[in-house]
Amino acid sequence: MRRLCCALILMCAACASAAAANQIYLTDAIKNPAYLRALTGLLKNAGKLPSWTRQVLKTSGDYVGTPVAYSTIGGIRYELFDACKAHDCGNNAMELMFAPHGAKVWAVIVQDGKSMTYLGSPSAAQQAALKEAFQK
């Protein structure tokens, strides 16, 4: 019985480790040229943004991010990534929503803990999904 328990524990640990290794972060996504191109265009056309937001364009940028989450709107599955300023996540953060294959990206950003600003002209449904993901 003891061997069975040990074997089960080892299997669970291996599965958890494999699952964590398969999670995709923004740093992984932007290695795909389509994602990087969409994100670069979004930030370039957004006007004046805090300097930390440019860090999301780097595969080893100085920001904090979490693994991808998904939202389906109108039958389309979007990828959601959040990123925040290192050491100040509560006040400076953004949520990014990528269309399939990185074809386009929209975002919501909060600067200095103030109101949300949407980038890329997301639809009302996309804004709702961005806001919901941001508040999690």
How would you label these PLM feature ranges?
Residues C15-A20:
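Sec/Tat signal peptide C-region and signal peptidase I cleavage site
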Residues C6-A14:
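Bacterial N-terminal signal peptides
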Residues M1-L4:
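Positively charged n-region of N-terminal signal peptides that target proteins for export
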Residues A21-G47, Q111-K136:
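C-terminal partner/receptor-binding element of secreted or periplasmic proteins
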Residues L8, T27, R37, G65, ...:
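Intrinsically disordered, low-complexity regions enriched in small/polar residues
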Residues A46-W106:
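Mature extracytoplasmic domains of secretory-pathway proteins
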